[in-house]
UniProtKB/Swiss-Prot annotation:
Belongs to the GroES chaperonin family. Its main location: cytoplasm. It comes from Corynebacterium jeikeium (strain K411). It is found in: Cytoplasm. Keywords: Chaperone, Cytoplasm. This is Co-chaperonin GroES. It comes from the Bacteria.
Amino acid sequence: MANVNIKPLEDRVLVQIVEAETTTASGLVIPDSAKEKPQEATVIAVGPGRWADDDDRIPMDVKEGDTVVFSKYGGTELKYNGEEYLLLTQRDILAVIEK
């Protein structure tokens, strides 16, 4: 897992996208133009959660190391130390993949 000095705020989650397969099971190479935008990522860092109306933090549903599925067009792309990351809000995360 990447070691980054980025600390997400509130209910934001920093993820690194899991690259999609470049070949099919039968060995055919998938060209870049035919690939769909990936929606699976590994959680790198998690914010402390949003503040609720009663001044308590709303706990986060994900933790570092989780593999998640996120909304196709959610988040903000960023580069840090030559690596590409995506900064999502917790609402952009649709599911946790249990392994």
